């Protein structure tokens, strides 16, 4: 995950631009704040559980908005995404909103974004609520749901690596 991932995904999904959570500190940077607001970002306090933002995100999904979320919750340049820990927020939000999930994988050489480095955007098939909750049996298991969704995202990267050989 890199700082420009939301911009790349917005460009790839032009028909329905997703909104994004961004750490609240970014909204105090004079040049950056207007740009991220224009991309539909809204602030989140990462120092603890920001219940207001979670509820806002659930409501946005319930009302048909697209929301881009990153299961890892932070950037780890140069690290294979499949080896990174996953946070439970994505699972909690998606299961409470009964949202369909569109997995997106950004493939870049060495897992590091760079100026003029080519990026391949791989968009998978939507994951319905019934699938990631096991027919509703795992509805409250946010950690499981986040890991399941993230595994489906990582599969996109693995499948594309297999095709390149």
Give the label of every model feature segment.
Residues 1-48, 56:
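Catalytic core of membrane glycerolipid acyltransferases/transacylases, capturing the structured
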């Amino acid at each position: 995950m890199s700082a420009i991932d939301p911009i790349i995904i917005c460009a790839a999904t032009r028909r329905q631009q997703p909104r994004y959570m961004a750490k609240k500190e970014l909204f105090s940077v004079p040049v950056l704040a207007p740009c991220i607001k224009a991309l539909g970002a809204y602030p989140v306090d990462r120092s603890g559980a920001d219940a207001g933002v979670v509820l806002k995100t659930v409501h946005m999904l319930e009302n048909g908005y697209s929301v881009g979320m990153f299961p890892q919750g932070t950037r780890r340049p140069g690290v294979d995404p499949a080896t990174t820990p996953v946070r439970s927020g994505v699972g909690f939000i998606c299961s409470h909103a009964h949202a369909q999930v569109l997995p997106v994988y950004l493939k870049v050489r060495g897992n590091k974004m760079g100026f003029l480095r080519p990026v391949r955007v791989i968009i998978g098939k939507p994951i319905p609520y019934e699938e990631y909750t096991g027919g509703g049996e795992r509805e409250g298991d946010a950690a499981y749901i986040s890991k399941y969704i993230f595994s489906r995202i990582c599969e996109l990267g693995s499948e594309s690596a297999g095709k390149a050989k």
